[in-house]
Amino acid sequence: MTTNYIFVTGGVVSSLGKGIAAASLAAILEARGLKVTMMKLDPYINVDPGTMSPTQHGEVFVTEDGAETDLDLGHYERFIRTKMTKRNNFTAGRVYADVLRKERRGDYLGATIQVIPHITNAIKERVISGAAGHDIALVEVGGTVGDIESLPFMEAIRQLAVELGREHTMFMHLTLVPYLVAAGELKTKPTQHSVKELLSIGIQPDILVCRSDRVIPANERKKIALFCNVQEKAVISMKDVDSIYKIPQLIRAQGTDDLVCQRFGITAPAADLSEWEQVIYEEANPTGEVTIGMVGKYIELPDAYKSVNEALKHAGLKNRLSVTIKYIDSQDVESKGTEILEGLDAILVPGGFGDRGIEGKILAAQYARENAVPYLGICLGMQVALIDYARNVANMEGAHSSEFSKDTKFPVVGLITEWIDGDGNVEERTEKSDLGGTMRLGSQLCHLAKGSKARELYGNATVEERHRHRYEVNNNLLPQLEKAGLKISGLSADKKLVEIIEIPNHPWFVAAQFHPEFTSTPRDGHPLFEGFVKAAGENARGEFEK
């Protein structure tokens, strides 16, 4: 099979939505029956985003095989059916680390190691390997054209276009066409300069996707085509929309996928976008609304919880409910009290690290438990629910996690020192292990208890979900917690680790050690989130007994 490549770059400013644009095109191509994959090349020196601050970089998206990756891979999985792996995202840091490791082993036989050819060759090898077995691979290069960090990646994709042949490669460049109110017109000059910058490193774009707050008229598109040396039909107007799930239809209407198929000589049926039409219909026609409080510590950057945000919206679609997320700083719960949680239809505590705001999260779980408010805890959100239950129901005064209190009498949550990974191998960790790449990561099997809400929601006895944590429930204290009424409704493959807890005498209180948000999609949703949002709707309608 010959793989064709679409290299996606961005110019003018960052955060234009290269990932969304690329994923939307990928969704259309997939809807035409083609086997599509996507890749993200990140120019930063970190080996992966696993230890980067969520308030700087956004969330870390975890793949099935346990790779800690850029949040754009979450967009990819939400738009196309292909599952991402560790091969679909790599950084400059990863490439340099691999090249230096080979140099230390003597693999280069004494050669002087340089950016060209050694680094660029390593990039090309990873791109080819990650794209193997697919009809089309869309490869997104992070950053903005002109950034010094991205130059090795730009050079690598330029070389790939030469080596693979232009009949098997395309360049799609995303730019900004701003509207100046004072002048009363759109300005194309930034796009022209961005393409000029791209040309200076040997890359001629084949498709220009132009972001704007309005439709770019034909005369402006013609002007862009003339000065940027592209076909007029290859200048795609991508105006701002109220839902990212409308973008596949937006670019399909302009024949973008036809340009791709013509270039690669592919004959494929017309795109069937009926699933996306259904998503758009459900989003535009809710029958009610709910407000869900998300109590976290990274709320100044909503992208820190990107997959959770999207999963709540997906669940809203399935329940025909408009979901409003109210972001609440857990430190505010500590300082202002739980009064700020009043009026919410449901409460969600997402994952996180560190002790800042931890007591606020525990208070949020306690408030939901005591006031019959639907509660969904994810990762740390399960652990704080457990701590609250231990302290205030099981009479374990001062109970805490050993992550935050080394001398607590009741360490209901502790460091996992040994577990079985998804491949059946034994993993071991200690307090002295590195922070990066040492957590329990990736998809793991979970056994669901009979009669549990979790089993009812999933409709199966087992399920696989993705993990990212190094602390777990302390099994030594489980008997005391269960005696006090806590229900363990999910266990790991070897049945040694607690994966899900529930409170049976509560209308809807479920908390999971794993991250269900990573497998939610707009077309399919996710059972836990669907059940949670449904419960929020029932609470909003006054159907819960307080």
From Swiss-Prot:
Belongs to the CTP synthase family. CDD domains: CTPS_N, GATase1_CTP_Synthase. It comes from Aliivibrio salmonicida (strain LFI1238) (Vibrio salmonicida (strain LFI1238)). This is CTP synthase. Catalyzes the ATP-dependent amination of UTP to CTP with either L-glutamine or ammonia as the source of nitrogen. Regulates intracellular CTP levels through interactions with the four ribonucleotide triphosphates. The gene is pyrG. UTP binds at residues 14, 187-192, 223. Pathway: Pyrimidine metabolism; CTP biosynthesis via de novo pathway; CTP from UDP: step 2/2. GO terms for cellular component: cytosol. L-glutamine binds at residues 352, 380-383, 403, 470. Homotetramer. The active site is at residues 379, 515, 517. The keyword Electron transport does not apply.
